[in-house]
């Protein structure tokens, strides 16, 4: 089945030709889908009825909103969406002074197996289509009636494990004729799929790459992240240097602090030594407690001390502001609770 919302402009023009229509109709349809964010062909005011009838063979991907939780602390909203095949995914709206940011999922489930992450419990179900990634943003923008200015691909899934669909999503999201979010306002995370980082670098996109590092050496990283058994910290950092050389974009390293595991002064100093000379920034995250995992988050003081020790060694660090902590804010938790509830009611 042709997924019309995942098609770029040239592909839409080809489709118009195939069904006996003028190519200019592609621009109109593209605008309705990606700028006006309509959910049906009937809403496309300047499209003739005869073309609308033809287009009914190509269903528009529209996510079904199952649940929305709103934080009483900071207004963060967590959305649970159902896909057309019944799978569920999560997205998060975060409100900042500079605008509205949405964190989206790139897969239903995840196969990376990071020990502290809820979204990988149960493994990978499937990759999301570009249209399913886009529609998370479109549904939320429509829901709040305000423009989404920033997008973070840091929800459930490993984005670079869904590489081709991710690239298509990025181009539709950032190019003219649609919602047109600047590449500089886009962040894509990865747990460290080294070959894909090189490929992404060669695309020379102007987005931010956020690398989940979480440890200063291979031994500790293997305790937390199975991917570390495949690619060493040295290999990962070399790929990051290549990414910066190709794009000029500073790397962000995500570092989740786990009490007694990776939060000591020595860990900070070792991390700083590894990152020396690399144009980067470290985002420190007290690990989110997950019911099925035994990890304990570092104390506030331990997090502050880690930041101070990094900066003493010349590495910039910030402590991530916690958003939506009262609404199952960590990746995968809302989806998992909903699935458990559904199972218990059967």
Give the residues covered by each predicted segment.
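Conserved alpha-helical substructure of the radical SAM core
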Residues: 120-150
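Canonical Radical SAM [4Fe-4S] cluster-binding loop centered on the CxxxCxxC motif
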Residues: 95-132
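Short beta->alpha connector loops
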Residues: 87, 97, 191-195
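Conserved AdoMet/S-adenosylmethionine-binding subsite of the radical SAM
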Residues: 141-150, 155-317
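Generic beta-strand structural signal
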Residues: 77, 89, 100-104, 112, ...
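Auxiliary Fe-S-binding modules of radical SAM enzymes
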Residues: 1-89, 241-250, 255-346
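Residue-level structural signal for beta-strand termini and adjacent loop
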Residues: 93-94, 165
């Amino acid at each position: 089945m042709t997924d019309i919302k995942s098609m770029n402009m040239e592909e839409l023009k080809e489709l118009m030709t195939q069904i006996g229509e003028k190519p200019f109709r592609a621009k109109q349809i593209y605008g309705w889908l990606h700028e006006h964010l309509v959910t049906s062909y009937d809403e496309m005011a300047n499209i003739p009825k005869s073309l609308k009838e033809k287009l009914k063979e190509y269903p528009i991907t529209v996510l079904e909103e199952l649940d929305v939780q709103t934080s009483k602390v900071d207004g963060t909203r967590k959305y649970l969406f159902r896909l057309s095949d019944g799978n569920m995914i999560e997205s998060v709206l975060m409100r900042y002074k500079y605008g509205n940011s949405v964190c989206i999922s790139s897969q239903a489930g995840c196969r990376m197996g990071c020990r502290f992450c809820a979204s990988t419990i149960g493994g990978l179900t499937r990759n999301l289509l570009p249209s399913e990634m886009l529609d998370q943003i479109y549904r939320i923008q429509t829901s709040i009636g305000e423009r989404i200015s920033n997008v973070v691909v840091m929800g459930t899934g490993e984005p670079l494990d869904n590489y081709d669909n991710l690239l298509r999503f990025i181009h539709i999201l950032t190019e003219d004729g649609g919602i047109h979010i600047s590449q500089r306002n886009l962040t894509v995370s990865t747990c460290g799929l080294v070959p894909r980082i090189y490929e992404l670098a060669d695309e020379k996109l102007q987005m931010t790459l956020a690398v989940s590092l979480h440890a200063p050496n291979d031994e500790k990283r293997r305790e937390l992240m199975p991917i570390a058994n495949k690619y060493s910290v040295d290999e990962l950092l070399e790929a990051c240097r290549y990414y910066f050389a190709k794009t000029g974009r500073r790397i962000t390293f995500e570092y989740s602090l786990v009490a007694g595991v990776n939060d000591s002064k020595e860990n900070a100093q070792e991390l700083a030594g590894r990152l020396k000379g690399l144009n980067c920034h470290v985002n420190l995250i007290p690990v989110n407690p997950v019911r099925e995992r035994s990890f304990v988050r570092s104390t506030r003081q331990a997090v502050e001390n880690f930041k101070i020790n990094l900066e003493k060694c010349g590495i910039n660090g910030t402590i991530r502001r916690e958003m939506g902590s009262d609404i199952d804010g960590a990746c995968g938790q809302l989806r998992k609770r909903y699935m458990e509830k559904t199972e218990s009611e059967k």
